[in-house]
UniProtKB/Swiss-Prot annotation:
Binding site for NAD(+): 324, 343, 400-402, 407, 429, 453
Family: In the N-terminal section; belongs to the enoyl-CoA hydratase/isomerase family. In the C-terminal section; belongs to the 3-hydroxyacyl-CoA dehydrogenase family.
Keywords per UniProt: Fatty acid metabolism, Isomerase, Lipid degradation, Lipid metabolism, Lyase, Multifunctional enzyme, NAD, Oxidoreductase
Native species: Pectobacterium atrosepticum (strain SCRI 1043 / ATCC BAA-672) (Erwinia carotovora subsp. atroseptica)
Disulfide bridge map: none
Protein name from the UniProt record: Fatty acid oxidation complex subunit alpha
Functional summary from the UniProt entry: Involved in the aerobic and anaerobic degradation of long-chain fatty acids via beta-oxidation cycle. Catalyzes the formation of 3-oxoacyl-CoA from enoyl-CoA via L-3-hydroxyacyl-CoA. It can also use D-3-hydroxyacyl-CoA and cis-3-enoyl-CoA as substrate.
GO MF term list: 3-hydroxybutyryl-CoA epimerase activity; delta(3)-delta(2)-enoyl-CoA isomerase activity; enoyl-CoA hydratase activity; long-chain-3-hydroxyacyl-CoA dehydrogenase activity; NAD+ binding
Residues that, per the record, bind substrate: 296, 500, 660
Chain's gene name: fadB
Length: 729
């Protein structure tokens, strides 16, 4: 043993070849600050070995290096800019020393080499990969860019176009694709990886391979003439602007970094990369996107812990073959849980099966599955008009019309056809579980399971614990949701649960703005273009359905009369009365036409202005900032109330529910992260200026207390101790 660190060790192999093995405690290797420092110490040891002829990098884990340790990011980014800059210079000096070793170097990549793991292997002369390997740089998805030389080495190895595509999109590529673009020299079976690596190193040592020739391009300027450079970078910037937009600065800055560094040597280019990395790392967007990653890990970890040893339901059923029922049936069957789809008429059953077939055909067209797999999935959906076989189901999801009497009747009837251990769940979006449970003999086996539309695309499932719901029921439903490929978040019972409860004050704010003379198109524009929602409130209401929103609004008003009841006719009332139900009948706030691809495109409809004139004050211009404040404060206030009442357990779960269920702009990180970025004190001041507009603008007590203490929802992060040259401060 030449060197033993916490997360890597150094050994002699044979004939002057040393191996550096990444071997972190735990199940995966990450390139954290300690590992980087340890790599530096290993290189110190290698520098003292006169007989060194070659170096092999490998992992003793199932994956090479899965990336940097993202749990360190927020504390690293909290460090003063100059300290973070110093640490990156120190870290890059280590990768440069690896790259500059006076002997050939090779990385044997098994499974994942992502982020810092990819940047590490780029510093070696050769790379071999197993067939299952994935190699890439996902940093821009976290609001940052590669910081260990990725923007420098990858373009010089692959050429600008391939590197720009990987870096700007935060992509990883398969071993086969890596071989095509020249990222690896060969793809080798797992059991032959190390022998092949040693053989290749020996060829380099013996002069059969020009290892310095492989290394040289990484140290020099990019091989591009002016016209090639202009075409590559202009195209890349246009693509980034189209896909990432202005709210996500990392991809564009990464492209501009590569462009500016194209004529530089390695060391000059690294200085620019470091400067731009620090700029991004200290941005609100990076904090938000890293926060989402960590919150996602927390939510999924909590679900896994909650399930424990609970078995996944093996047989399911869904009541109702409408849009939601059909979507649930498709998703269950697609993920391997056979499901009975019951309805009272043949027509909806046929529509449900056709919808499933249509979704599967799209997967076939994309090459995601073959005809045999498609047939198997469709065979796992059993359309039925009766309860035959329901006694063998483990879980039944009710997805009939959103009417408490109808739902209660269907649930009670179903309960008489299932076993005593079968779980019943309702896909209600607003009706309290306690209300529906009153009709059941076994309320302990009942809970809410709220899917979002379209089911196959939306990642969130809100699981609602009723007053009598048992822990084992929740565990089984969480297990089923996870098996379906969804992110389950457990909330407590109230009208609207969590997501719809916080959505309707937002819609109420929209109605108030219209009443006060705002143009709904300007509101949509501000909320989409400026704030970053995928749809503004008018467009969202059209997609949800004006009739659905009108009904849900009444449920919410009954549940929370102080805040959500209104004493005036609003735009939703008017459109509902004129049977403008949104996309479902082609007219709502906008008019809809189906394009050649079958997608509905919205168009302006001047008739709406005439309808809304009677319930609105004369037209008045509002700034984007005014619109955003008036729209977002009621939603954030309701999120705060839900946290204070224990409807949702944590800021992390609240934020992920909003991102995954409503499309809350990820670069804001969710309502709690957004509030923390604004500052609770500033937020309360903004809300107080609008308090005259009504109860939805009243800040709850707990949030007022946070403002007085200048606290946020997330704990403040102390700067990382290891940013001073990789050592504990």
């Amino acid at each position: 043993m030449l060197y033993q660190g916490e997360s890597l060790y150094l050994n002699w192999l044979e004939d002057g070849i040393a191996e550096l093995v990444f071997s972190a405690p735990g199940s995966v290797n990450t390139l954290d600050t300690r590992t980087v420092a340890s790599l530096g110490k290993a290189l110190d040891v290698l520098a003292e070995q006169p007989n060194l002829k070659g170096l092999l990098l490998r992992s003793d884990k199932p994956a090479f290096i899965v990336g940097a340790d993202i749990t360190e990011f927020l504390s690293l980014f909290a460090a003063p800019a100059e300290k973070l800059h110093e640490w990156l210079v120190f870290a890059n000096s280590i990768f440069n020393r690896l790259e500059d070793l006076p002997v050939p170097t090779l990385s044997a990549i098994n499974s994942y080499a992502l982020g810092g793991g990819c940047e590490c292997v780029l510093a070696t002369d050769f790379r071999l990969a197993t067939p299952d390997a994935r190699i890439g740089l996902p940093e821009t998805k976290l609001g940052i860019m590669p910081g260990f030389g990725g923007t420098v080495r990858l373009p010089r190895l692959l050429g600008a176009d391939s590197a720009l595509e990987i870096i700007a999109a935060g992509k990883d590529v398969s071993a086969a694709d890596a071989l095509k673009v020249g990222l690896v020299q060969a793809v080798v079976a797992n059991e032959k990886l190390i022998p092949a690596a040693i053989k290749m190193l020996k060829q380099a040592i013996n002069g059969e391979l020009d290892w310095l020739g492989y290394r040289r391009p990484k140290l020099e300027a990019l091989k591009l003439n002016k016209i090639e450079a202009m075409m590559s970078f202009t195209t890349a910037k246009a693509m980034v602007l189209q896909t990432a937009g202005k709210h996500y600065p990392a991809p564009m800055l990464a492209v501009k970094t590569i462009e500016a560094a194209a004529t530089m040597t390695r060391d000059e280019a690294l200085q620019l990369e470091t400067q731009h990395f620090v700029q991004l790392a200290r941005s609100n967007e990076a904090r938000a996107l890293v926060g989402i990653f960590l919150n996602d890990q927390y939510v999924k970890g909590k679900a896994k812990k909650l399930v424990g040893e609970t078995p996944v339901p093996q047989q399911a059923a869904v009541l109702g073959a409408g849009i939601m029922g059909g979507g649930i049936a498709y998703q269950s069957a697609f993920k391997g849980v056979p499901i009975r789809m019951k309805d009272i008429n043949e027509k909806p059953l046929a529509l449900g099966m056709n919808e499933a077939a249509k979704l599967l055909n799209k997967q076939m067209e994309r090459g995601k599955l073959d005809g045999m797999k498609m047939a198997t999935i469709l065979a796992n959906i059993h359309p039925t008009l009766d309860y035959a076989g329901f006694e063998r189901t483990d879980i039944v999801v009710e997805a009939v019309v959103e009417n408490p009497k109808i739902k209660a009747s269907v649930l009670a009837e179903t309960e008489s056809h299932i076993s005593e251990s079968t779980i019943l769940a309702s896909n209600t979006s607003t009706i309290p579980i306690a209300v529906l449970a009153a009709a059941l003999k076994r309320p302990q086996n009942f809970c809410g399971m709220h899917f979002f539309n379209p089911v196959h695309r939306m990642p969130l499932v809100e699981i609602i614990r009723g007053p009598k719901t048992s822990d084992s029921t929740i565990a089984s439903v969480v297990a089923y949701a996870s098996k379906m490929g969804k992110t389950p978040i457990v909330v407590n019972d109230c009208p609207g649960f969590f997501v719809n409860r916080v959505l309707f004050p937002y819609f109420a704010a929209f109605s108030l703005l219209l009443r006060d003379g705002a143009d709904f198109r300007e509101i949509d524009n501000a909320m989409e273009k400026k704030f970053g929602w995928p749809m503004g409130p008018a467009y969202l209401l059209d997609v949800v359905g004006i009739d659905t929103a009108h009904h849900a609004q009444a449920v919410m008003a009954e549940g929370f009369p102080q805040r959500m009841a209104k004493d005036y006719r609003d735009a939703i009332d008017v459109l509902f009365e004129h049977q403008r139900f949104g996309q479902k009948n082609g007219q709502g706030f906008y008019r809809y036409q189906t394009d050649s691809k079958g997608k509905q495109r919205k168009e302006q409809d001047d008739a709406v202005d005439a309808l809304l004139k009677n319930i609105s004050q004369p037209k008045k211009a509002f700034s984007a900032e005014e619109i955003i404040a008036r729209m977002m404060i009621p939603m954030i206030n309701e999120v705060a109330r839900c946290l204070e009442e224990g409807i949702v357990a944590s800021p992390a779960e609240a934020d992920m529910a909003l991102v995954y269920g409503l499309g809350f702009p990820p670069f804001h990180g969710g309502a709690c992260r957004y509030l923390d970025t604004l500052g609770s004190e500033r937020y309360v001041e903004m809300a107080q200026q609008l308090a005259h507009l009504g109860a939805i603008y009243q800040v709850p007590d707990g949030l007022q207390q946070k403002a007085r203490s200048n606290e946020g929802y997330y704990p403040s992060v102390a700067p990382h101790a290891d940013v001073s040259h990789g050592q504990p401060a």
